[in-house]
Amino acid sequence: MSTKIPIGPFHIGLEEPIYFKIDLEGETVKNVDMINGFVHRGIEYLAMQKNFFQNLILTERVCSLCSNNHPFTYVMAVEKIAGIEVSRRANYLRVVADEVKRIASHMFNLSMLAHLIGFHSLMTQTMEAREIMQDIKESIWGNRMDMSANTISGVKYDLDEGQIEYILKRLDELEPQVDEIIDIYFNHKIVKARTVGVGVLPKEDALRLGVTGPTARGSGVNNDVRVKAPYAAYDELKVNVILEEGGDVHARTKVRWREVKESIRLVREAITNLPEGPVVLDKRPHIPAGEAVTRSEAPRGELIYYLKTNGAQKPERMRWRVPTYMNWEALRVMIPGNKLSDVAVIFNSIDPCISCTER
Amino acid sequence: MKETLKQKIIAELKNRITGDFDLRDEKDAKGNIQIWLKLFNRKDILHVAQVIKDFGGRCVIISAYKKDDHHVLVYHLDIDGILINVEVELFDNTVDSITPILDSANWTEREFKEMFGIKLVGHPNPKRLFLDESIAEGILGEYMPLSQAMNGAATCCMWEKIESERHKNEH
């Protein structure tokens, strides 16, 4: 006999505002239907009522965990239309802000995995290690989430010797803790029992559905924007793309942890080789008529902005697509065939961002 | 290497497109290539989608906007890091779905159908994506209270709706 059960914001299994209609046979999920739209806010329309500088603030607030990537990708589009060349120093500083966000974002998602499999000591340990990144954000940018690092033609912050030393010291503190935690996530029998072979996304489905970020890389698909279409200083700071072949929750977990390590390396490299120069242009630029498309690699995957301008102070059209938007449909492949108790774990493994997706 | 791939893509596009078109390509300081294509016969988007599929590419997103009295779609398609932007003007407010060719276009087509009221031909699952059924299509651009725009308005309303649906199924 089949049973239908709803999982959503009113159900203990899931905190996110999304509604899953699940058909069960025994304990196994046969079919899943997803209904979204609970938090649609019409931000895309709002963006066309604001001028180019106001939109810096607005895009930063689309979502908190990718909050650096939104204004980052947006300013790149504005700069492309206006023909502005950003200084090398500003480009390096953009990378620093972005990689700091990636470490903190990945570690948050990974601690959520520990929470969902009921391994609470591991969750606390991960969150405590992540606090180091939060401290860095608060000390350098003044905020724990919205860093407001980017502006049109450069960045709003600079790093002096003391700040660089502070970041390096804190990263030295973080790395051994990360190594210790990684070992548990990779090898502990509780974690493996709940993640290995769970929520499998085969490579061909990953390609067919156009998934991005760690979800794609966990299935062996490399579409990391930092390498495929480099921007800012990523062409100079060569990124090593992390790929896993398993396609299951475990593979995605491994991708994120290995990326945390890679991001630590990138931050170190960027701040120790910081080029000299201005961080922002003196003059406020005029934004002429034109159109541009820019992309960046957010913690969850590729983020793309399309901007069309007509010479006025506000965009004529601004459209963006976040990684979760593409990874969503992959859940229809990942969830069926698994146990009901695994649904929340699988859902978490795409690192869902609903406020981004629905805008 | 990217340059060779670009040449191949352009040759294949020129070969398959039946109507008139404008084509240009650009390269930024980092060597990233973008191709801009404007189609004058909207049916050609199916041929373009097939080229993308043959090269193992994907649909990244489709941007819709209103220009004077008609809609414009800009398809953003990717082949191994090369971005192909395809502009199509819709004078009859109708477009053929490319989802049967590129699965990755599924959501974005449903979204422009919902937000701009563009008619979609041949989509395998043209259901609403974000907004409640009670709201008319083509809503983007009209003022609407947040509580009404959101599917559930409040958790309790959503819960009541699901419960009533569930009971309907049981009877």
Please state what every model-predicted region is.
Chain B
Residues 1-171:
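Terminal low-complexity/charged segments
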